[in-house]
């Protein structure tokens, strides 16, 4: 997952459904191609951490340049409590015109509450990722503008110090585990205190790739045996001392930025959002200066490994939705903004500041890797631009509940408090008791 928190979805649903009973949403009167006219219009749009998250202002300014009569005014929310605050504003009628969908899990809740406008009439460019995550009962309720995917970050200098060849894009999980062992031995022999791997404490570091890659994977099915080999690989690396153990990571509140950015680890699986952070921190000195690159995440089998294939990974989109209670006179302008946010021009604007857009093509890739501090090797470009990305969080009303008990399973396995088999069996039982056939 990205550094986000799940809100209490049950509470959100109750608040939104109550709001839906008291008023009805306006009906879309124009499609994404309709003109907003030339009259001055001000749209409000939600965002968070505006001083350190430039994507909102970047898109608002670029859109205004193309549509001088339309101003997009940003409304800042606390990043940690974003969805709780947004739920309250939607229920009270204080939410902005355009709502940034930070967490996919809330889409069904907002849609069921009648809080989002149906934007199915907005035509999206071919090849855009993440659109299906915003579809509920056949209707689209948001448009993706960014799509982060998980890749393998690696420190080229530490690989060289350990005398281990860099990743070549062909690794399976067995190759990854083998490389971790060689790296750990090589780094120790070279007198380095760095570990081969840093695995953050999130459940997604194991489960996200299992869900995307393993045969029979998918959290909505309620049977989690398919995750077993992924936990076996993770525990093997941990037990061999090639990474800080889970209890150390959680007790000491280690950060992935600090561990990789300060060269405490040679490899780390993380989402592409970290690229912009690492470039920025190397520029400010908060991260060390070293040579780094990206490779595809290790694959379940050789069928998807290698640069002649399409590697499988995971990640959720971030998108824009329209408040169902927007002034009808602003609907066309809001849809024009969503149409722009999904366009190639918007993708280039995002790529130029190190953000991974939902639309990736050769021109966008060139723009992204022209950013000062970005890696320039061909494998990094391949890893960033070529992949099949499955959602971390399926768009389903039960997703938040399922992810909660799967997080408990993850903690039990990685901390050693339960065996893999026992923890998976408990998760299967939790699905039956908490979700069942709902």
Language-model features: where?
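Conserved N-terminal structural module of periplasmic/extracytoplasmic solute-binding proteins
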Residues: 2-108, 166, 286, 301, ...
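A local structural motif
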Residues: 66-77, 94-95, 163-168, 235-251, ...
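Short helix-initiation/N-cap motifs at beta->coil->alpha
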Residues: 76-85, 105, 171-177, 247-261
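Short helices/loops that flank or line small-molecule/ion binding pockets
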Residues: 83-94, 113, 158-159, 177-182, ...
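Hinge/lid segment of periplasmic solute-binding proteins
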Residues: 102-149, 293-295
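Extracytoplasmic/periplasmic substrate-recognition and gating elements
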Residues: 162, 239-243, 283-353
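C-terminal capping/gating helix-and-loop segments adjacent to ligand/active sites or protein-protein/ligand interfaces
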Residues: 363, 377-430
